[in-house]
Structures are given as C-alpha cells and as structure tokens.
Regions:
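…primarily DNA-binding HTH/wHTH and HhH modules…
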Residues: 1-14, 246-247, 268-284
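Alpha-helical residues within the helix-turn-helix
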Residues: 208, 219, 223, 256-257, ...
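Short hydrophobic/aromatic patch on the recognition helix
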Residues: 74, 217, 221, 265-266, ...
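Short, Lys/Arg-enriched, Trp-marked, Pro/Gly-tolerant hinge/linker segments that flank
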Residues: 120-121, 145-210, 223-235
Length: 284
C-alpha cells in the first residue's frame, strides 16, 4: 500500500477537498485512502469526474438520490460524474477512492461508445485480486498533499492506470443496489427495513409499524419503485447478507439474523435471486 493510513476518523466529515485529487489527461486516475470508523458519515457531495469506491477492509454504504449500495471488500461501487452521493461506514473501513478522468462526452473506463450507457448509472462491481492489488499500488495520500511525482513515478503510474482500466472493464456487475423512493412515508419505511431487515418478514408487519395499511404500502412500492415489497426486501436481504459475511459471520448466523428459519432456506433464496451459491455470491 503506497500510503500510510491516518488516524481513524469518525462522526460527520466535511467540508471535503476533492480538488486536491482532480484527475486529468496526464494523471487519469487519482487515489485517496482513508481509515473511517464505524458510523462515520461523509456529507453528500458530487464532482465532475467518475469515482470507484473500494473498501480495502470493512463495509461502507453509499447512498444516492434514488438508491443505496453496500460495498464490502470483495466489491466496489462505480459512481458516474456529477452524481451526488453520501457515505456511511457500517464497520471500520479502509476506504480507497479512485477518481477517474472522463473526457467530455464520455463515461466509463475508456469503453466503446456502445458500452457507455451501462456506465452512466451507479453499479456494484466484483473486485478481482488483480484489480485490488493494482489499485493499492497507485500513489495515494490521505489529504492529496503528497510531493510531486518524479518522471519515472509518473510513467509507472501511467502503466498502472492502464491496467486498472483494463481490469475495470472486465469487472462483473453484482446486484447489490437497493432502490429508494422519493415519497417521504415510504422512504421512512425503507430506511427502517435497511436498518433492521429481520424485524418483520411480511408487509403487514412493516405497514403496522408505520401506521399505514398494507394495501397503501404495496401501492406505493409499485408506483414509486416499480416493484413489489417482497422483491424490494429481497434486495435488502442480499445486500445485508454481504455486509454480514464481510464481518466473517457464519452462514447459519446470517440466515438467523435475516429472519430465515434455516440456512437452507436462505441458500435457496440466494440461488433463486442471483443464480449463484451463497459462498460465491457472498465472497466467502
């Protein structure tokens, strides 16, 4: 790792200094490394370049206007230019942020024009061992105030950047995003489910908590998110399972935490949802 980590930060963080890490054609990828304590909150912000958030250790949650994403060490989140986002640390994390130069009118890790649409949305990606190693080799400082790079260091950084972009283009998307509504009533219910998804297993239980009828809540899910409560909650459970697995929680304990009667019932849900075994999906 090219930079020593600073002391652990906690609580709300802001104002930010993204200009210190601004990428450009000469240095197309800039890296920032921070150690953030549990419950640290980074204020909503945006910047005119793309971002790849990689949790080297720990688990973070990134929230945008219409969704939230869980990022454990085996995954990363791509954030397109101009998208406002906030960060909440779920367990103490070494957060490596890559800022990527995006030429005018382009979006993505130097992909063909026909592939750019997929990169204009936030997406969770698998992080290969090679991508992680390359990203950690980039020159990273906690405050962007490192000394100027030598000519040899700049050439090496250029080669590393090319390899990072190549690995990023090959990274597979993972369904760990959870859509969030604009309606305040439904948003409050969704935040409650995200905070404690195993509290209730039925729509009736959650509707009772928020003082609305199940029919009203079901209608709001359809009109606001275009999905059913059951389908939406399933995405929450998948995201929470990944976060728990990153803390090395056993499969049986994860199943119980999420309200499943048995590990086999939880495994069946994962296979049905993502077409992969729990161990493969959870990165364990």
């Amino acid at each position: 790792m090219k930079a020593s980590l600073p002391h652990t930060q906690s609580g709300p963080i802001g104002p930010l200094t993204p200009h210190l890490y601004m990428p450009d054609a000469r240095r197309p990828i800039r890296a920032k490394l921070q150690r953030l304590g549990t419950d640290t909150r980074v204020v909503p912000h945006r910047h005119p370049w793309a971002q790849l958030a990689v949790s080297a250790t720990g688990v973070v949650r990134l929230t945008v206007a219409h969704g939230t994403y869980i990022v454990p060490p085996s995954r990363a989140l791509w954030i397109p230019p101009g998208v406002e986002h906030a960060v909440t640390v779920l367990s103490t994390a070494d957060l490596l942020t890559l800022y990527l130069h995006q030429p005018r009118g382009r979006c993505g890790p130097q992909v063909a024009a026909a592939q750019q649409a997929a990169w204009q949305q936030c997406r969770v990606l698998e992080v290969s061992d090679l991508l992680r190693a390359l990203a950690l080799e980039l020159d990273a400082t906690a405050d962007g105030a490192g000394p100027p790079l030598s000519a040899d260091a700049l050439r090496r950084e250029g080669r590393l950047c090319a390899l990072v972009l190549d690995e990023l283009r090959r990274a597979l998307p993972v369904p760990l995003g959870v859509d969030l509504p604009a309606d305040k009533r439904l948003r409050a219910l969704c935040e409650a489910v995200l905070a404690e998804p195993g509290r209730h297993t039925t729509l009736e239980g959650w509707a009772r908590d928020c003082g609305a009828s199940p029919r009203t809540v079901a209608r709001l899910f359809r009109s606001e998110l275009g999905t059913s409560f059951v389908q939406w909650r399933q995405q929450v459970l998948l995201a929470r399972a990944v976060a728990l697995a990153a803390r090395r929680m056993p499969m049986a304990a994860i199943a119980a935490e999420l309200g499943y009667a048995s590990p086999s019932a939880f495994s069946a849900m994962v296979r049905r949802s993502v077409g992969a075994t729990p161990s493969r999906f959870l990165g364990s």
